[in-house]
Amino acid sequence: MLWLMTMGRRLNGVYAAFMLVAFMMGVAGALQAPTLSLFLSREVGAQPFWVGLFYTVNAIAGILVSLWLANRSDSQGDRRRLILFCCAMAVGNALLFAFNRHYLTLITCGVLLASLANTAMPQLFALAREYADSSAREVVMFSSVMRAQLSLAWVIGPPLAFMLALNYGFTTMFSIAAGIFVISLA
């Protein structure tokens, strides 16, 4: 009987929502990241230097935007709205990559959208931590299970990404990623 009571306490709706959203956002991200260099070289026609430059600009912008949004989130404290905003940016980013093949557009608008979108996952983990602290859950276990969801997503996502990209095209792959982010918004 005690086992049933503790199991029911562990499997509440909020807990399940955190796990599902972490998994889905992880899959959507894992669809895009591993195939990016292939997309840039094959679809956009970028030479190796430009692919490397894209990754460099993307990393620097991601760090700067993430730091800025983290400071803003810590001071204002509304992580839910920020996560929703970041997921909306992720949808826009995936659709941009699905239907645009112009390098300058991708390295400007795409990098900006990706930088904003990539902030969603750390904010989700911060919100989960706040939830675990306030609900008397075991914080370490809760965080570990969420990280396991993200790891599982990264086991499933890359092979799925290459299967979709090589068999159905990058437009389909990025559109599916956008769809997964839309579902994560709900």
Task: Give, region by region, the residue ranges found by the protein language model.
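Residue-level signature of mid-helix packing/kink "hotspots" within the transmembrane helices
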Residues: A59-L67, W154-V155
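Structural signature of the two symmetry-related core transmembrane helices
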Residues: R81-L96, S175-A178
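Hydrophobic core of transmembrane alpha-helices in multi-pass small-molecule transporters
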Residues: F23, N93, Y103-M121
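Symmetry-related core transmembrane helices of the 12-TM Major Facilitator Superfamily/SLC fold
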Residues: T172-A186
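Transmembrane alpha-helix termini and helix-breaking/packing motifs in multi-pass membrane transporters
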Residues: I156-T172
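Cytoplasmic helix-loop-helix junction between adjacent transmembrane helices
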Residues: V111-A148
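Helix-loop boundary and gating motifs at the non-cytosolic
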Residues: W3-A59
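Helix-to-loop junctions at the C-terminal end of transmembrane segments
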Residues: L64-D78, A165
